[in-house]
Amino acid sequence: MISVESLAAGPLLDLPLAELWFALIFALLGTFLFLDGFDFGAGAIFATLDDESARETVLSAIGPFWDGNEVWLVVFGGALFAAFPRVYAGLFSRHYLLMFGILGALILRGLAPEMYEQRHDERWQRWWGRSFVAGSVLAPFLLGAFAGNWLVGSPRSFTLVGIVVGSTVTVLTVVSGAAFLGLKAGRALPGAVHRIGVGAVVVYLLLVVATLGTLAVTLPAGADALLSMPVLALVAASIALAIAYAVALRRGANLAALVSAAGLTYGLVAVVAVVMYPRIDPATGLVVEEAIVSTLPLNLMSIGAALLLPLVATYFVVLYSAFSGPITAEESY
């Protein structure tokens, strides 16, 4: 029988809970970057479309999903706060400007489509269309800047590493967005969307090289931090996934392309986690074992997460199943 005494005595089932929560934090971040990432990418692609019908198609494709996808950002923040409260406090106090910027961009991205649909006036829709694009581009850029600064332990919000990583994440969302729009909208969108996706994945690989080069100069351990076998394996896997993505997109295998984009997203987040570990707050030197909460709340949280996360995942399975398949001409945002 589980008792308070047993829960306070040691880790649940003798599991390495500190390391598991570290991995879970980054898995949640990767899930948000992928699921909301293709929404962001669709918003960026929206800027390249002149035809009103094509723009409405983009809005219809992401309409059922974008607000639900943002749940994963809340779960990420909640998990970081619950498991590593000192890290949460330090990160959010050092980078509060970035946090406000991310929230502002997310609000703009959510508000703009609603306002866009309220009036069919050219000037009105041009303004809110641009706002939608701005929110869709700024949100991943600022989130990437936050992740880059977190990795190198910079106390400043705007750095070279932040700009490079932010640009990398933004282009990665376009990669995901092109595959998602191909899957949901199909022939309702011009073929240029696929070409944008192929071009974006090439730019993404170039930015990955730029990111690794910047980290080699910025990280205290230098290039040695990037030459470990896990990092090299993740980079090689990313190259293979990028090639698979481009081939799949050209052949119209949009689901395969979207799966490849998911692999690229989780791979990028995994590189950050591997390079950072065992530290979780490089700015202060805190390592995972030092930053984790005490045994009793850690065990209770682990039980709660084991029960609740499958429920959240089930909700998303139901959501995506209910709105599966390509959108029809009758659907609107």
Question: What are these model-predicted stretches?
Answer:
Residues 1-22, 80-96, 147-162, 217-224:
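Helix-coil boundary and interhelical linker segments in multi-pass alpha-helical membrane proteins
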Residues 46-55, 83-89, 110-129, 183-193, ...:
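Membrane-interfacial helix termini and the short, flexible loops that connect transmembrane helices
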Residues 90-100, 108-169:
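Membrane-interface helix-loop-helix junctions at boundaries between adjacent transmembrane segments
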Residues 138-152, 206-217, 267-284:
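Hydrophobic alpha-helical transmembrane segments in multi-pass integral membrane proteins
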Residues 164-170, 297-315:
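Hydrophobic alpha-helical transmembrane segments
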Residues 218, 222-275:
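Internal helical hairpin/lid segments
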Residues 281-300:
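Short, membrane-exposed interhelical loops at transmembrane-helix boundaries
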